[in-house]
Amino acid sequence: MIPPDAKHSSRKQSERATEIIAHEAAQFIAREAGTESLITVIRAQSIAHGDRMNIFVSVFPVEKARAALAFLERQRESFSKHLKEHTHLRLPRIDFLLDNGEGVGEYPKS
């Protein structure tokens, strides 16, 4: 059985890693994205015991959401490299999702 303190410590580490990845994603996007749209990191969510990380973004203007997510998908490997260079975290698989304003992520409609 895992002691209660270990569970709390593990959850706190996971939350901290999620915050760091969200912050690094915001910095990376600000540096790499063009000026056609404004891409803002809303939050990150760790799933599958930290093996995957969903990064929720908003895009303005909304009409540029598909292009922005396509850009982020193309930059996924570069972002992983950025994380490796700037953090000492175990690297999860990163997925970028559009935040629909209700705390739920969605892929852009085709």
Q: Which residues are covered by each model-predicted region?
A:
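Charge-rich, low-complexity N-terminal segments
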Residues: 1-110
